[in-house]
Amino acid sequence: MADLVSSCKDKLAYFRIKELKDILNQLGLPKQGKKQDLIDRVLALLTDEQGQRHHGWGRKNSLTKEAVAKIVDDTYRKMQIQCAPDLATRSHSGSDFSFRPIEEAYDSFQPEAKVRCICSSTMVNDSMIQCEDQRCQVWQHLNCVLIPDKPGESAEVPPVFYCELCRLSRADPFWVTAGNPLLPVKFVSSGVTNDGTSVPQSVEKSFQLSRSDRETVQRQEYDLQVWCMLLNDKVQFRMQWPQYAELHVNGISVRVVTRPGSQLLGINGRDDGPLITTCSREGINKICLSRVDARTFCFGVRIAKRRTVAQVLNLVPKEAEGESFEHALARVRRCLGGGDTAENADSDSDLEVVAESVTVNLRCPNSGSRMRIAGRFKPCIHMGCFDLETFVELNQRSRKWQCPICLKNYSLESLMIDPYFNRITSLLRNCNEDVNEVDVKPDGSWRVKGDAASRELSQWHMPDGTLCNPKEDVKPAMQNGNEQMMEGTSDGQKSLKIGIKRNPNGIWEVSSKADDKKPSVVGNRMQNNSGFRALNNIMHMSNSPTSSYRDGEDPSVNQESNRHVDLSLNNGNNEFDSFSLNFGQACNTDDRPQQQHNATDVIVLSDSDEENDAMVCPPAVYDNTTTANGSGFPFTTNGIGYTERYQEDAGVGTSGLGLLSNNVDDFEMNNWQMHSSYQQPEQGFQFFGNDTDVHNTFVGSHNSFGLAPNDYSLDCNVGVEEASVTPALSVCRNSNEMHGSLVDNPLALVGDDPSLQIFLPSQPSSVPLQEELSERANAPNGVQSDDWISLTLAAGGGGNEEPAPADVNSQPQIPSTETGIEPLTDAASAFLSTNIERRSGADLNPRRIENIFSHPRQPRSVRPRLCLSIDTDSE
């Protein structure tokens, strides 16, 4: 018997308080008191009954001494499994109770079976749940820790479960638990009364502080803290006190919350744990908590150590240890809608990227300054970030570990550094604070937006921060070194430059190097030594990107409407930028045989949606022969017309191109809106009128161009045997009697419009302005003759002469044959014929002044097709 008592005494001296309490719990004895008191209670069972009466136990324990010894031996064997040192290595002295086993730093209350519940029972049953913390992993009773929201319902098992101590450590990472004098105590709800009010409740507990614990909490970085937590809180990691909570520690009242007692804690609110270091003392301490709340809480007392901001920041994983750069880049691509090309090739997502890049603000949502270290919570699906240091500093006081972008609650262990945006912010550290935006493409490439300290940051970078390869600007090769084309915006009128100069003799000639094929100006005539092959190759540029050719198009749409074009006659490639909309019908030379058009020589231009519209064939041609006096340039049309002719003034210095100034430099003229031509070497043109029934007739004009510089006459075929002679008409005069034929023509101010400077003489013109526009006969196709005008400009002295007889051309309407276009000056002079839409009784619209040479508006259904007949020169 003595050996049994001696063996049990040695084992009891080795036990911790928890093992002693566990033994006393199995024996049915009280578990309060110091460790020596607990040992004495167990040893008393191994002695006589006098010891039991001495300790004041009123009932005799039914267990025998052998049963008590067996319980002690089983407990000792369990501790041996946990690597307890062998008793043989220790002194067998019965009075050796000074040995104190090393307790675990995280939680001293951790049984060998790792079963710890707030109900203080270590029994294992069928309904258990384990903590997910790798350092804890304790098992708890499911019914004790999972509380349903409504009574009678079953509690929902969370996907990730943490015990109350692990939740406490994550609620405020600036406090780390160093000990638990009072383990979690469940504050069970007492229900409500019949009138629906909660029943006041209070619980009183005692905890013991040893001398070492007391000395620890007296240190500056340690404190004794009381905490409380709602078991089924929606915000898992926070403290929360019940309503009307009142706390007393050793009889001293302690305030727990600053909000009113009746106010519930909101979803974004946080409660703090009061510090009771000044209220505690060494030894036994009593704590009492009362409340009026039907919810289930648990509270406890812990020894906590403060952490600094730097220490908390060190808990955040480094950039290399956190998320990989590939995952961060994939998230950015997903958020911008670009995604990975290989993975999302078959994606049918509704998100479409419209902009080439997205502007991302690098300002921290908390501080408003540019982020230094880009931080984020790992579970967040957005790409927004915040400044890591600022976020941690703010949470030292607020204890709200919540994403400022999506407002979801997390813990410190979910905080990380974003590797994608952190590379960008690290490159911007030397920039000014106003540089806080970057443009990010869907593939992850980026550039700094704004004035950066370095020009390299304003260039596009790869996602990893390296510079993108600069794209080389590929300029189209010119067909000829003398041919240049300069593009401009649609903000204003540009100019048309022709490379000609006046020689010392007063004769205009091409201002370039000598060339066998370049045309020369001799005796007021344009001649070409090679049969005028200078205009063989014509490069055409469209005037209307929308192909509508309307005078009311938005200039922002017609980006190609205004260009600088250099027309050089010293090479074989010349640019006709959208010739006049109403330049005649066709061209013909009598010295060439007439040929029928081939299918390949016809180009049909139409913006109609209908595919089977009837084509308008070219009915008439321009006869490229001279008149009786050898100086005519007859134009043949069908309809009522007028012939006006003016002879130039053969003064000194006014040659065939006397309209120009005496400056020896290249002259410059404004570029009017021209109709689009097409790149064919042939010279046949057919344009359409206002009437949908126009088939083989061309709309007549009431006037023609008297081309004074080269002594040309514009002859009109009026459909009768003789030409009609009329008085000279006014030049582009704005009149209400015109009925909209020329809508507020600004050319009425002769000499003011720069577009006509190329046709004005060098001296003041004496052309009388007359007007006779009333009672005119309609053309056979229904278009009134007042719908056609001509700009008659000439040098002084010839304006009052009688017009020469018209060269009437009554030949049948035949297709155009091969011909060569006359020199550029002749063609440019004839390209000003303007067709204006007939609008009976319409008022003049001043808003269309700037579009005097534009094509008239027509509905799509009445706009006929254009048949462009071009004959190829076989030579």
From Swiss-Prot:
Residues the record lists as binding Zn(2+): 380, 382, 403, 406
UniProt domain SAP: residue ranges: 12-46
Keyword Metal-binding recorded: yes
Gene: SIZ1
Species of origin: Oryza sativa subsp. japonica (Rice)
InterPro entries: SAP_dom, SAP_dom_sf, SIZ1/2_SP-RING, Zinc_finger_PHD-type_CS, Znf_FYVE_PHD, Znf_MIZ, Znf_PHD, Znf_PHD-finger
SP-RING-type Zn finger ranges: 349-430
Entry EC number(s): 2.3.2.-
Function of the protein: Probable SUMO E3 ligase that may regulate Pi starvation responses.
Compartments in which it is found: Nucleus
Region called Disordered, residue ranges: 796-820
Gene Ontology cellular component list: chromatin; nucleus
Pathway of action: Protein modification; protein sumoylation
PROSITE patterns listed in its UniProt record: SAP (PS50800), ZF_PHD_1 (PS01359), ZF_SP_RING (PS51044)
Main location: nucleus
Family: Belongs to the PIAS family.
Lineage: Eukaryota, Viridiplantae, Streptophyta, Embryophyta, Tracheophyta
PHD-type zinc finger locations on the chain: 114-169
Record key words, sorted: Metal-binding, Nucleus, Transferase, Ubl conjugation pathway, Zinc, Zinc-finger
Keyword Metal-binding: yes
Name this protein carries in UniProt: E3 SUMO-protein ligase SIZ1
